[in-house]
Amino acid sequence: METSTVNAVGVWFYSINTQRYLYLLRNDPRHPNTWGLPGGKIENNETLVEAMTRECHEELGFMPEYLRMVPLEKFTSADKGFAYHTFFCSVGKEFIPTLNEEHIGYSWITTGVWPKPMHPGLWSTVNFDAV
């Protein structure tokens, strides 16, 4: 029996003027009170960028104008049932998100300083020298 893959997308925003990254504090039953990124499940026939834009509108209140967007990573679960696409987006300056019910806080954090507790899936993404 073949199973379909659930695809999701997330975006890691970086402010050029402050050299800090945006993290959101999760408010959901899976991994509650952990720091993560804006993002979520890709719906219907959305492209990755369309899903990323929609998720930002839902979770941040708008899609920030980015200067550069780079695909950072595609994580696929061992059973191939889940794939998460992470993008890096640089913005000129920090912004204040209008959070929806999925998050209870946000923080812009300096490079190399990690918010705790971090969502377990995010740690492997951000913990490498290329970023």
Question: Which stretches of residues belong to each language-model region?
Answer:
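Catalytic phosphate/metal-binding cores of nucleic-acid and nucleotide-processing enzymes, i.e., regions
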Residues: 1, 15, 34, 50-53, ...
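Conserved N-terminal beta-strand and adjoining loop/helix that marks the start
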Residues: 1-22
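Active-site-adjacent beta-strand/loop module that shapes the phosphate/pyrophosphate-binding cleft
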Residues: 6, 17, 73-97, 101-113, ...
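Conserved Nudix-box catalytic region and its N-terminal flanking loop in Nudix hydrolases
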Residues: 17-59
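Short, structurally constrained coil/turn elements
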Residues: 31, 63-65, 102
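Short strand-loop junctions, especially beta-strand C-caps/beta-turns
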Residues: 40, 111-112, 117
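A short coil-to-beta-strand element that immediately follows conserved catalytic motifs
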Residues: 63-73
